[in-house]
Regions:
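N-terminal nucleotide/polyanion-binding subdomain common to many enzyme families
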Residues: 1-66
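A short acidic, often aromatic-flanked loop/helix-cap motif at beta-alpha or helix-coil junctions
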Residues: 31-36, 81, 126-129
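S-adenosyl-L-methionine/SAH cofactor-binding core of RNA-modifying enzymes
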Residues: 53-103
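Structured adenosyl-cofactor binding patch, chiefly the S-adenosyl-L-methionine
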Residues: 111-153
């Protein structure tokens, strides 16, 4: 719903240098697929309840018109599979990855089921929107794409590579206080 958030900081530093060469980013505004003049993309939950739900017809149309067959689709949701280092590494091998940034109470479940969408969570907490979660996922994945990091060994020597946390880090000067 807010494509203007992207690429954000991903357009800076090493990620920014690699953007357009080693990785690409496209955004879709689902409001462009709304059927009314006000571009409404949400409605109240069927059966009642608090909050709003992203409408099935709008989301499905945006997916159908923008995603090719067999491309992986992930809906960023607090109830999904927990995102971790191992999964980031696995996703870095995908030719294309489509992230749905949720808002409100979520998206109509019928779209998730009918489009073979995987739900992924970055943790047990609630964010105001899925864009922050998308940045977490993208940042983690981009590190594994060969050539993105300045040093090829950096991604292989990460603290999680051996299942352990990294040792304390120091730099110069040796005595600072």
């Amino acid at each position: 719903m807010y494509p203007e958030y992207f690429p954000g900081y991903l357009n800076k530093g090493l990620f920014g240098k690699a953007m357009g060469q080693l990785w690409n980013l496209e955004t879709v505004n689902i409001r462009d697929y709304a059927n009314d003049k006000h571009k409404v993309v949400d409605d109240t939950p069927y059966g009642g309840g608090n909050g709003m739900v992203i409408k099935a017809d709008v989301l499905a149309k945006s997916l159908d018109e923008n995603i090719k067959e067999k491309e992986k689709i992930i809906y960023l949701s607090p109830r999904g599979k927990l995102f971790n280092y191992k999964y980031a590494k696995e996703l870095s091998n995908e030719k294309s990855l489509n992230l749905i940034c949720g808002h409100f109470e979520g998206v109509d479940e019928r779209v998730i089921q009918s489009r073979n969408i995987e739900e992924v969570s970055i943790g047990d907490f609630i964010l105001s929107g899925g864009e922050v979660a998308a940045f977490v996922v993208l940042d983690s994945i981009l590190r594994f794409i060969p050539g993105v990091l300045g040093n090829e060994n950096s991604a292989q020597e990460e603290s999680f590579e051996n299942g352990l946390l990294e040792y304390p880090q120091f730099t110069k000067p040796q005595i600072w206080e």
